[in-house]
Amino acid sequence: MTEQVQANETETPVAVADERIIRETGIDAKVAGIVEPVINTLGFRLVRVRLSGLNGQTLQIMAERPDGTMTVDDCELVSRTVAPVLDVEDPISGKYHLEISSPGIDRPLVRKSDFSDWAGHIAKVETSIVHEGRKKFRGRIVVGEADSVTIESDQISYGNEPVVRIPFDLISDARLVLTDDLIRDALRKDKALREGRIPGDDLGAEPEDVASTETQEKK
């Protein structure tokens, strides 16, 4: 692994005003409760925690900076910091692989601000209960408001309203759909950050770091 970036040692803790509206359940929630304060202290935001049966057991922790970036060095820093905390708390039985990654381009949408930041792009949204006659929605994010998001369908669907307002408290899962427009806009934003047009730091990584990952095995 590369050396820890010195700037990260003095990161400002992330404010919790923009809390996640989509949260984990079960063991994932237990792990999230352990690692989120640690990640915030480093200056990052937790996106998602998921324990899967991939390669035995894999604990995936998605994180990002407040500006949405996440480099390989960032992943390594988070990995080195949360690993000993998880060793002490020991929330998972048996061996597992710890994987720290960025949200990627087709990212999960877990905060109200995510919907506003990616307005104009296509997303898939699921609700915890039936809403407007269904629980699954797909469409362009028209606008993210204080308590809801409006989705305009990008596909012909007979019997369903083309424009639907979905309250945030009903959303159980949401993520962007990978499109050419999304890839172009994500890379444009990444380039702008590197050139200093948008405030940001530690921007020396290549665009591929949008999907960067750091993995280690835990016993």
From Swiss-Prot:
One of its GO terms (biological process) is translation. GO terms for cellular component: cytosol. The keyword Oxidoreductase does not apply. It comes from the Bacteria. The keyword Cytoplasm applies. NCBIfam families: PRK00092.2-5 (NF000932). Required for maturation of 30S ribosomal subunits. This is Ribosome maturation factor RimP. It comes from Brucella abortus (strain 2308). The lineage of its organism: Bacteria, Pseudomonadati, Pseudomonadota, Alphaproteobacteria, Hyphomicrobiales.
